């Protein structure tokens, strides 16, 4: 049984390169001795394995991993599922499924988000205070060559980050409590009020998005309002799990071993 780890390219790990490497390394260490980790841009068709433990996001790498899947290899997360985390596709799919996401209209401003891939820089997810600012930022996106985007209304409430692994592992945290941030956008929601909400319901919705995409190792963001209503504002394949790395790595190892033995 040959296992290979695929490390995420730094362009898709803004301010998180080492954190992403650490969670992948811990998982590989738990799966066996001296498992090779390859940068996703270095993966070639000649690199054959039974299992690919992958954090890859480059389109060329995903195409290669899809070929490996089609040939019978186990890939976690599946390259097909990672493609379905594209914001444009996922936002529409969640809307059709009736899952709780922000409307495109609101009174507290807007978020303009790159829709064709995960954010690579702060410029890919931008807060706009009104329609005029939104139009200006959309023009800036076009100048940068970005024409695929989504618009979400800004929602007042607590920002919650959640992390999950298929099979039951689920944790959530308030980033404004510990100050860990990629781009500092959390400050727009202010200090966390820790509004009461149904954690089991949030986990159930997160697991539905996991099933919708096929992503088995995932993370995301939600906004919890004062009334306890929550909205999913982001969902990603294999985050760094920096707030719960040890627990998460054990859950991922257990999940992958079960998949191998099933």
Please state what every model-predicted region is.
Residues 101, 147-151, 217-220:
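A short linear hydrophobic-aromatic micro-motif
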Residues 5-103, 118:
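Conserved N-proximal alpha/beta basic substrate-recognition cap immediately N-terminal to
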Residues 115, 154-155, 163, 221-223, ...:
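Anionic group-transfer/hydrolysis microenvironments
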Residues 181-232, 244, 251-262:
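A long amphipathic alpha-helix within ATP-dependent nucleotide-binding catalytic cores
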Residues 128-213:
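Phosphate-binding site of ATP-dependent enzymes
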Residues 49-53, 113, 162-164, 228-243:
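A short beta-strand motif that forms the metal-chelation/ATP-contact edge
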Residues 110, 170, 218, 231-234:
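Protein kinase-like catalytic core scaffold
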